[in-house]
């Protein structure tokens, strides 16, 4: 079998033309090829009518079909009758019907996107200017009663406009006198008002440490070893206490017997 490929045509030549099976294959192949050629011709005609066909020329792009919307699916189910399927409607006619329905659905979606005012869609939380934490804290009903979305947008717009005004920005060409006059009211408040201490007017303060803890008080004080404030009662404290007593005893013994040994040596 020899195949010669051309644009839109395909020719087949068999070496055994008298074979009946070969003739049947040829007839079935021609019938299928003619139906494919008709569908391709229709698709080329649609592309030539569209603005993309003029720019692409003879070549064409196979665009994947758009997924039908729920309304289109219902319309397709309504319009498809079992009688048409029983009669054996051609595939090309069903494809044409589907394409027309898809075009209509796409047109409806485009109209919906172009005219959002006609659709009454409730305002979502994402589009709201008021943060969700405020609505959660005070309740959405209370927030809606106190402030509306328009008022919130207006307040935010005024704030941004005030920031964008050049008059509100501190100019770099201001003299130090002008700069000091701007903050004069702030510095007139005083240190206590500016630091939020509010301790009142300054007063003469006198420490009572020397008046209460005089040398007489320290001399008359009696230290109770058993009930000494800050005394450690754990094993480490006991060991240090015993060690201090041993060191003091050793020093006393050295002083006592050291003097006796020195006197004997003399």
Curated annotation (Swiss-Prot):
Residues 1-15, 24-38 have a biased composition (Polar residues). GO terms for cellular component: acrosomal vesicle; sperm flagellum. Its main location: cytoplasm. Only detected in testis, in the spermatids and sperm within the seminiferous tubules (at protein level). Disruption phenotype: Mutant adult male are fertile and there is no significant change on litter size compared with male wild-type adult. No differences are found in testis/body weight ratios, testicular/epididymal tissue morphology, sperm counts, sperm morphology and spermatozoa motility. It comes from the Eukaryota. Residues 81-102 have a biased composition (Basic and acidic residues). Pfam families: TEX33 (PF15400). Keywords: Cell projection, Cilium, Cytoplasmic vesicle, Flagellum. Residues 47-63 have a biased composition (Low complexity). Residues 1-124 are annotated as: Disordered. It is found in: Cytoplasmic vesicle, Secretory vesicle, Acrosome; Cell projection, Cilium, Flagellum. Seems to be associated with spermiogenesis but is not essential for sperm development and male fertility. This is Ciliary microtubule inner protein 4. It comes from Mus musculus (Mouse).
